[in-house]
């Protein structure tokens, strides 16, 4: 079920109904907002199929921020989305292109075993497939405007997404 072409996907991070990603479908084209962890990727791909489109129809993966419960699966998911561009905050993009600091930091906090259990192996996203967006910049999905607004409260690399068509905010971890 969707409203305004927005499908909510439970990423199954840690427990049910704790973390979500979104699939926006407009005129047969798709965009994800956030992606969860590597373990979430099969759920996201199933949502694409349930929405009646294919992974080749996904044009955008927009991450609100690089914390691993929201963007840890970006590298793996992008491998499955041949036509997608990853959209990221200027402070987030370098960590998605080269996740070594994310890996080191999370491993230091959680340990190797928990890191693997919760997030899996983080993969880089090729720089050529990453689009950095500044505050107020708009990305388009089949004519649907998605505006990226810098919201550094939760993390300095966080932005929220305003979808004018549905009059909805995608807030990541910002209230």
Set out the residue ranges of the language-model regions:
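Conserved beta-strand hairpin/beta-sheet module of binuclear metal-dependent hydrolase folds
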Residues: 1-51, 55, 161-171
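Active-site metal-binding motif and surrounding structural segment of the metallo-beta-lactamase
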Residues: 42-88
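Active-site neighborhood of phospho(di)ester-bond hydrolases with catalytic His/Asp-centered motifs
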Residues: 33-36, 58-65, 87-89, 151-153, ...
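Core dinuclear metal-dependent hydrolase active-site scaffold
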Residues: 23-25, 136-163
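Metallo-beta-lactamase
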Residues: 96-149
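Short, glycine/acidic-enriched loop or turn micro-motifs at the edges of active sites
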Residues: 13, 37, 68, 153, ...
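Short alpha-helical
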Residues: 39, 68-69, 94, 101
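A short, structured active-site edge motif that brings together acidic residues
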Residues: 87-95, 99
């Amino acid at each position: 079920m969707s409203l305004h072409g927005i499908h909510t996907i439970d990423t199954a991070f840690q427990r049910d109904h704790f973390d979500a990603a979104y699939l926006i479908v407009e005129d047969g084209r798709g965009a994800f907002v956030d992606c969860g962890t590597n373990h979430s990727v099969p759920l996201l791909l199933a949502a694409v199929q349930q929405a009646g489109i294919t992974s080749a129809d996904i044009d955008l993966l927009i991450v609100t921020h690089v914390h691993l419960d929201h963007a840890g699966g970006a590298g793996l998911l992008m491998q499955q989305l041949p036509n997608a561009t990853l959209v990221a905050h200027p402070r987030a993009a370098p960590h998605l292109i080269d996740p070594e600091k994310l890996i080191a930091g999370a491993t230091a906090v959680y340990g190797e075993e928990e890191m693997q259990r919760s997030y899996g192996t983080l993969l880089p996203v090729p720089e050529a497939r990453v689009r950095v967006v500044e505050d107020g910049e708009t990305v388009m999905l089949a004519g649907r405007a998605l505006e990226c607004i810098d919201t550094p409260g939760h993390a300095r690399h966080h932005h929220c997404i305003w979808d004018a068509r549905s009059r909805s905010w995608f807030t990541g971890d910002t209230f």
